């Protein structure tokens, strides 16, 4: 407190104590709370405090009792953090949707340096149960992390290559332990992202098949108890890809599945992924009565990821897309052993 504020506080506090006969008889915790509220009102602009106190005092008696019960089980800070987490996620989804589907913005929304980087910080979009293990690295690093997760201490010297002999760089790999009698079994989700303006077609499906087949054919992966799912993600797909994921005796969206059902490829659109995310958050959104405004959500995304999203308003050239089969990683510049 500044000197003047301290003097004001002392004067007002003295008057409170002398003017309220039963103040000294109150519980010490209540006395501290009241004096703390008084200090906050003097130190800061009173609008925030008035809003908070007004909301609490305006609660129906039943809601006040519910809040009191909650505060006996957790802290107000934890309650606020939980509500903020849901509100932030709803704003994130609305902002991301705008970036992905706005006709002008998506022209300049880059896959590798922007979309990829944002999603690496928000892997909950692909499922709450997963954690990021590989970010924009080679299939060789995927093998290393897969072995590490299951406790295999094996040195990987020879690089993993696709069936055609080329090197592959995966965008994101997420992992989780599968509830199973076999404690070392894991689920791995490999996500291949495409810029929103890129329709999934033959080149893109061939690229992700190359990753899946590399895992399927490399004998070093076979000794690791794991299930593999590959997602190929963009806004839309062309007629070729649509026919590939609409085959008889196979669920729609499945591009390929191994005979042992332990490895498969799914083609996902952002509309499907965003819908699934909102469905998971729907009950919390209803209770929070939170409506994610388009402009406010876009501002939230741009403020949170200001450094990453620089240039999304520019009219410069769009980012050069990766050519399937020609991915390059620093680790792959070293000659094979």
Residue ranges and their predicted role:
Residues 1-337:
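Charged, terminal alpha-helix-loop-beta segments
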């Amino acid at each position: 407190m500044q000197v003047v504020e301290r003097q004001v506080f002392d004067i007002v506090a003295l008057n409170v104590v002398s003017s309220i006969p039963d103040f000294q008889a109150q519980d010490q915790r209540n006395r501290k709370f009241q004096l703390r509220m008084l200090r906050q009102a003097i130190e800061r602009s009173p609008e925030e405090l008035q809003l908070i106190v007004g909301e609490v005092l305006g609660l129906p008696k039943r809601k006040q009792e519910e809040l009191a019960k909650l505060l006996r089980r957790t802290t107000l800070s934890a309650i606020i953090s939980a509500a903020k987490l849901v509100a932030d996620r709803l704003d994130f989804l609305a902002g991301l949707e705008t970036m992905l589907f706005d006709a002008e913005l998506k022209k300049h929304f880059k896959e590798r340096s922007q979309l990829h980087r944002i999603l690496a910080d928000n892997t909950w979009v692909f499922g709450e149960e997963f954690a990021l293990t590989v970010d924009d690295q080679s299939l060789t690093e995927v093998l290393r992390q897969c072995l590490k997760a299951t406790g295999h201490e094996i040195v990987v010297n020879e690089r993993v290559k696709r069936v055609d002999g080329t090197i592959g760089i995966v965008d994101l790999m997420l992992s989780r332990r599968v509830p199973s009698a076999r404690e070392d079994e894991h689920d791995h989700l490999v996500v291949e992202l495409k810029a929103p303006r890129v329709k999934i077609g033959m080149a893109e499906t061939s690229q992700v098949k190359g990753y899946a087949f590399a895992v399927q054919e490399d004998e070093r992966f076979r000794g690791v108890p794991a299930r593999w799912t590959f997602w190929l993600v963009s806004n839309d797909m062309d007629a070729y890809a649509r026919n590939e994921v609409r085959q008889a005796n196979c669920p729609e969206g499945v591009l390929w599945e191994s005979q042992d059902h332990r490895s498969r490829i799914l083609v996902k659109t952002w509309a499907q992924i965003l819908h699934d995310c909102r469905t998971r958050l729907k009950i919390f959104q209803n209770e929070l009565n939170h409506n994610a405004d388009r402009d406010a959500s876009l501002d939230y995304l741009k403020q949170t990821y200001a450094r990453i999203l620089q240039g999304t308003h520019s009219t410069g050239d769009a980012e050069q897309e990766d050519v399937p089969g020609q991915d390059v990683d620093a680790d792959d510049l070293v000659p094979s052993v």
